[in-house]
From Swiss-Prot:
The gene is ubiB. Belongs to the ABC1 family. UbiB subfamily. It comes from Ectopseudomonas mendocina (strain ymp). The active site is at residue 288. Its EC number is 2.7.-.-. It is a multi-pass membrane protein. GO terms for molecular function: ATP binding; protein kinase activity. ATP binds at residues 131-139, 153. Residues 125-488 form the Protein kinase domain. This is Probable protein kinase UbiB. HAMAP family: UbiB.
Amino acid sequence: MKLLAVRRLLRIQRVVIRYQLDELLLELPLPFWLRALSWLLPWRWLPRRPLALSRGARLRLALEDLGPIFIKFGQLLSTRRDLLPPDIADELARLQDQVPPFPEDQAIALIERQLGAPVSQLFARFDSQPLASASVAQVHAAQLKSGEEVVVKVVRPGLKPVIRQDLAWLFLLARIAERASADARRLRPVEVVSDYEKTIFDELDLLREAANASQLRRNFEGSPLLYVPQVYWDLCRHQVLVMERIYGVPVTDLATLADQRTDMKLLAERGVEIFFTQVFRDSFFHADMHPGNIFVSTRTPWSPQYIAIDCGIIGSLTDEDQDYLARNLIAFFKRDYRKVAQLHIDSGWVPADTKVNEFEAAIRTVCEPIFEKPLKDISFGQLLLRLFQTARRFNMEVQPQLVLLQKTLLNIEGLGRQLYPDLDLWSTAQPFLERWMRERVSPLHLLRNLQQQAEQVPHLSQIARDALERLQRPEPPRESDARDQWPLRLLGAALIAAGAVQGLAPLLATWPAWLMVGGGLYLVLRR
C-alpha cells in the first residue's frame, strides 16, 4: 500500500513538472512562506520551456494524464462554477471519461463471482465486446434466457485501493491549501473533496444505482415525458447491474431527430418540465443528465419521450429547500430582490446576522443586467450561479443539494436551447411553479402536514430526553488519526530523496537541498 502511494506521488510530481502546474499555483495569492518554500523544488532551478497553453488547458491535460479518478474529480470541479474562474471551469467541462475497456475474462469472472453461476447459465447470449467503457464501469450487451435484451454493467476491478490512494493525496492537497490561504479556505477545498469521495463511492455501488433507477421509473410510470429502463433485480449485485436495453436516438443527434420529424420545441419544453417535476413534485432528481445519458424514443416523434440511463447520482431537496427555492425563483423574475435576500436569511443559507439591505443591493447589482435581455435569452442556471456567487461573499454555507440542482439545471437548459434555440425557460417553468405553490397552501396539503406532525407527538418526550442527554454528555477529545498522517510522512520522504539528489548535483546550490532534507525529516518524524 505504501509502495503504491510512493509510486503515485512520483507520478503526480512528474505530471506537475510536465504541465508546469507549480507556475499555475504561484499565480494564486499564496503567503510569503509558501511562495519561498516553492523555490526548494529541484525542477524550479532547471531551465524550462514555457508551454503555449492556457492555464485551464494545462490543468485539464494534467488531470487526463493522472487517470480516471482525477478526471472524474475535474468533472466534479467543472460543475462548481460558483468557485472556479470561467476559463478553468470551461476547460474542465471538456474532460472525457473514456478509458480502454478491461479484458472480457475479468468482466466474466466478476459477473460469475457476484451472481454465483456461469455466464452461460445466466444469459442466452453475452457479448464479450463492451458497448461502452468508462472509469468506473463498462457495459456489455446480453440476452436473458426468457428472450429480453439487456445490458450488463460491471464495475472495473481493483478500483477501491486506487481511489483511496488518490483521495488521500487530494485530501492532503486540500488541507494544505486551506491552511496556506484565506482565499482557499473560502473555497472549502476539503469539503469539495469530501463531496467527491461520497459521489465516487456511491457510483461504485450498483445496487444503489439500481434502486435509484427503480424509484425514478416508478415516479414516471405511464408518463409520456420520461422512460426509465427496467431493472432485473434478481441479477443485480453491488458490482453487477442488469437492466433492460433501450433503443433510442442520442439527444445530441439533431440530424436524426429532424429526419424522423421530431417536434423539437415540445421536446425542449418537456426537458424543462421533467426537471421541475423531479425537483418539486418528487424531490428526487437525476443529477447526471449530461447528453451521454439521455436518449429520445423513436416511437412517437410528434409527442417525443425522453429515455434516461445511468442513475448513479441522484439529488433530493427537503420540503423547506423546495419551498425556499420556488419562492426565490418567482421573486427573482418579479425582480423582488429584497424578498430573495430575506428568503436566503430565513432559510439559513446565509448567516442570520447578514444585513438585508447590503445583500439586496449586491443581488440587484448582479441580476439587473441579466433582466435587460429578452426572457428567452435569460439562463436560469446562470441566474442561480450568479446568486450563489453573490451569496458566497456573504458567507453562504455550501449546500451540496443546491450545487447538484444548479449543475442539472445548466445541463437541461443547455440541452433545451440546443434542441430549440428560442426556448423560453421561464414561460415553461412559471405555470408549474405557481401551480406547485398553490398546492402547497391547499387544504389537502395542510391536512397531510397535520397528520405527519400528529404522528410525531408520541415521540416528543423521547426526543427531548435524548437531546438533554447529549447536552449533559461531554464530548471526548478528538485524537489525530494516524491514517491521516501517512501522506505527510510520505511527502517528507519524497522531500528527503529530492533534497539528497539536489545536494549531489554539482551545478546547483546546496542550501535548498539541506532545507528540503530538514523539512522532510520534520514531516517524517512529527507526531
